[in-house]
């Protein structure tokens, strides 16, 4: 578990335990299997409490990271019986942005000094020719997943997404610009 995230089972009266009890998770890290697992466990535990909270809040400052882990967390966020509100802090980039927009529409907040980066994802691979061709299929599936996620969460169509959020070059946005794009 990353030191910057809320503990899975908080102890004592420290501020992290208070956040956990309040239904707030502070995610300030790269997106990877370990820290996504921690957030998934947090959401699942909150959903199985006898007295559920009215909302959960996921505060995100992330440079991005691992797509499969990101989509695992997105699936759990979308399946949560408790609405998840998101807050973008400092930097939400790449997978960090995908997590941010998975928050309930109308309850996504970008702080004024948040930098937002959207871009086509990158990947690398090696292997025999047939293995590389097989990986192309996963690349195509991941691209489709990302486009579908942007469509559902922003209301933009594929052409608008490719033009404004996923062109060949990196796209940096201010909070105001992001809001205009449905982020």
State what each model feature region is.
Residues 1-183:
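Terminal-region recognition feature
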